[in-house]
């Protein structure tokens, strides 16, 4: 983690426009690190508002998106939730939005606009496609 934080300073000094981090799970503290804070909080502190921070990782609900913003993210990115729900962002105005989580049927994913090839790829993700 320390090497990544040092890299942040180098990237900021190089003139990047924003930093995007993938936490895999925004709600679990980093392993092998004594700091109990979430990864987003640690990176936000290091950035000190020098540029926007985009974070993703296991964000499914409106409440979780807000929690990540409260951790210091300027923007929240999503992957798995948007794969399963192409209209995910359109529900963020609903504070109680809590979409279905995996496993998804292949039919559901095809209905969401995924190609058969991508659905086959997602089968390799344990527990994502049934």
At which residue positions do the language-model features occur?
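Flavin-dependent oxidoreductase catalytic cores
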Residues: 1-130
């Amino acid at each position: 983690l320390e090497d990544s934080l040092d890299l942040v300073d180098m990237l900021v000094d190089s003139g990047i426009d924003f930093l995007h981090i993938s936490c895999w799970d925004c709600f679990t503290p980093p392993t092998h690190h004594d700091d109990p804070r979430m990864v987003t909080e640690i990176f936000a502190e290091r950035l000190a508002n020098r540029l926007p921070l985009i974070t993703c990782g296991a964000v499914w609900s409106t409440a979780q998106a807000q929690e990540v913003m409260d951790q210091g993210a300027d923007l929240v990115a999503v992957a798995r939730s948007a794969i399963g729900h192409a209209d995910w962002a359109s529900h963020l105005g609903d504070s109680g939005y809590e979409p279905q989580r995996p496993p998804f049927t292949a039919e559901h994913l095809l209905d969401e606009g995924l190609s058969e090839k991508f659905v086959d790829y997602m089968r390799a993700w344990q527990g994502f496609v049934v």
